[in-house]
């Protein structure tokens, strides 16, 4: 059986709705730069990322590593908000509660 080697040039499929989310994130980051008076050159120097990568982040490019987005958010002082993205998982809590309630019913029967 042949061993499959992952294709490093393959990128994730990004649906239009999710693409819009990334574009909005890029717009928000770009606006945060402007509000602070930061340039792409300054962000590039502080993160060690190329200006091309910074520009791609501003555009919400899905091919840019999430780590690069976090590096830029860190320079902007915005990582705390990013860390809380999936913190309040209301649907997950409801599903967990249903599962726990079903377990409890089986135990008491």
Predicted regions and their residues:
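Short alpha-helical DNA-recognition segment
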Residues: 37-55
């Amino acid at each position: 059986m042949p061993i499959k080697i992952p294709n490093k040039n393959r990128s994730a499929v990004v649906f239009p709705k999710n693409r819009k989310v990334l574009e909005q994130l890029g717009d928000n980051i770009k606006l945060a730069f402007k509000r602070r008076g930061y340039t792409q050159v300054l962000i590039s120097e502080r993160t060690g990322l190329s200006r091309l990568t910074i520009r791609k982040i501003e555009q919400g490019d899905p091919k840019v590593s999430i780590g690069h987005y976090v590096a830029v958010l860190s320079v902007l002082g915005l990582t705390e908000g990013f860390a809380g993205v999936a913190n309040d998982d209301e649907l997950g809590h409801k599903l967990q509660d249903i599962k726990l309630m079903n377990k409890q019913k089986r135990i008491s029967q």
